Amino acid sequence: GEIRFVETKFLSKLDNEIANNFREVVFEDKVYFNKTKINTQINFKMAKFKNNVEFVNLHNNVSFNNVNFKGIVNFENLNINTLNFKNVIFNNIVSFDNIRFDNNCKPNFENCTFSDQFNIEHKYIEYKFDEIEKTQEYDKLLNYRDLFRKLKSNRIAHHNLIDASELRAQELYARELELKHKENKSLKEKIERWQLVFYRKLCDHHTDLLLNLKWLVVVIGLFALLYFASRMIQDISLLKALNQYGVCLSIVGVFNLLCLYWFGCIKKFDFFVYLNLIVVLWVICYMPKIIFGIVNIIGDKSYNGFENALITIYTILLALVLFSLQKTARKNSIVPS
């Protein structure tokens, strides 16, 4: 029949002979844990739950190892340190409602299978690149990638494409770090690693449109600045053609940016972006056609070797950034069907 553990106390400690152990236990009917007090941790290694399970108001460590959940599993009002799942099969709906972890921890899922809806607040399965980067072990990085791949597939199956795209980015974080720590990489794997680095920096794997726009400004601004410097070296009189009011406004803008950066109001990369934005505004006002790069090569005007190389490199980079920009704008298109 149904089993209920209500306000039950598991008082054994790590040095006790009796452990809080449900090893290889088969629960045929519903199981309910509510306001259960556990001194150390409770272990469900190789247990089988053939019906619905509820864990409510738990306040300690819980581990599930080689467990098979046949029915619905619900974790509710948890306030615990760690929640570990290893080689666990969820055959039905899994729900985490109102859970809190001490020390900003997250539930740990290793080699788990999710066959139905997996309902959990996204922040508990969201990992930034810096968080994953702390992991130096190759096998753990493989586990991360496997987890993100399975959760991504689960989100796609239930039409949550926004979370799926973010999990796809996390999967690529793990793949990049996996390749970084892998020994004896092939040439193809080396290229793949740097490709992943490039797209992470450019647009966070097509999930950050603003970051992509910033790089567009940087590419155009740097090209215009180098092109103008090359022309000015050949003909210093070009400076006289610049609008004096525009020059004054630009100087004021640069000074303000320096102050904002000095006092920590903007980050280094944003400071660099805003400087290039000033250059882009000059380009729009005076010579917008150079934005299109390759048009200048087939024009009538002659260019020296440096300028030809600069325009060619710029055109390639601009094409990559614009391609990434349109793909990022159609955010859901990056999720595999």
Model-derived features with residue positions:
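Terminal module of membrane-associated proteins
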Residues: G1-S337
